[in-house]
Amino acid sequence: MKAPRLTDTTLRDGSHPMRHQFTREQVAKIVQALDRAGVPVIEVSHGDGLAGSSLQYGFSHTSEFDLIETARSYAERAKIAALMLPGIGTRQELKEAVARGIQVVRIATQCTEADISEQHFGLAKELGLETVGFLMMAHMRPPEALVEQAKLMESYGADCVYIVDSAGAMLPHDAAARVRALKEALSVQVGFHAHNNLGLGIGNTLAALEAGADQIDGCLRGLGAGAGNAATELLAAVLDRLGLNPGLDVFGLMDAAEYIVAPIMPFQPFPDRDAITIGYAGVYSTFLLHAKRAGEQYGIDPREILVELGRRQAVAGQEDWIIDVALDLSRRRGAGTRKEAHG
């Protein structure tokens, strides 16, 4: 293993549990602490990326461009990054983000849809940005299929391609196999982004590092979607124990998590019943509320609905499947009850 580059995404992935309510003052304090602690890249944007502030994804308290501008003004050494999802963010938002101070853009697609990112990588390169590709929900496809998608991003200009465990569904061998496959096939760097739904955020990140990952992600206090991400301060401590500290101030990150982030958190993300179900089923956390409503309507345990959605490999945008699945399960249960009655 080698010392990785760490990107802290408290101010992006952490925007989900914060309901996108970060303020300039909060961003200033967090960026200043991360920068002083030696974190080389800090991601700042709406949880769903540039232009995510909307009725569908949740409105931001403060414009993400204002937050980016604040972050850049307080970062003396760290680079400022933003997330961009094709279909949400456009050329206009990317250009504005550059004008406000981002130096890195992370372009995210479903792990089967890298081909929709070509224009986004092209523009990012024209604008002089470092570019990172995100293959989301990467647990859903085998390593060889992910290699094909990663090669597309590499050909479009990605400087690094990430395996992203969006649902927190991977086990350590899953993370290692996917990272190893990309390392063997690509000439650019490979990264890994963990979620903690099965309690494996740190473990999966270590497995990815053992497989050769060059870049990893974390959030202070684990503040991220679902059960949260690998905690930045924990990653720093573990890397230091392994002799792989890339220049991080372990105590400084512990203090930032404890005294700056913890007091503003609406709750502590952890693997509760709902989060575990998301990781176990391997589906997006956005399905959870819809599954609960459908379960109540049709008398089905929402966990059964989510597991079936995972079996069918439903992805974001296919929320309409939830009612169909609930109906199917209800009919099967009804048929089973009738058989018992006639038996």
From Swiss-Prot:
Transmembrane segments: none
Family note: Belongs to the 4-hydroxy-2-oxovalerate aldolase family.
HAMAP family: HOA
Stretches assigned to the Pyruvate carboxyltransferase domain: 4-254
GO biological process terms, semicolon-separated: catabolic process; L-leucine biosynthetic process
CDD domains: DRE_TIM_HOA
Organism: Chloroflexus aggregans (strain MD-66 / DSM 9485)
Protein name: 4-hydroxy-2-oxovalerate aldolase
EC id: 4.1.3.39
Binding residue positions for substrate: R12, D13, S166, H193, Y284
PANTHER family per record: 2-ISOPROPYLMALATE SYNTHASE 1, CHLOROPLASTIC-RELATED, HOMOCITRATE SYNTHASE-RELATED
Keywords assigned by UniProt, alphabetized: Aromatic hydrocarbons catabolism, Lyase, Manganese, Metal-binding
Keyword Lyase applies: yes
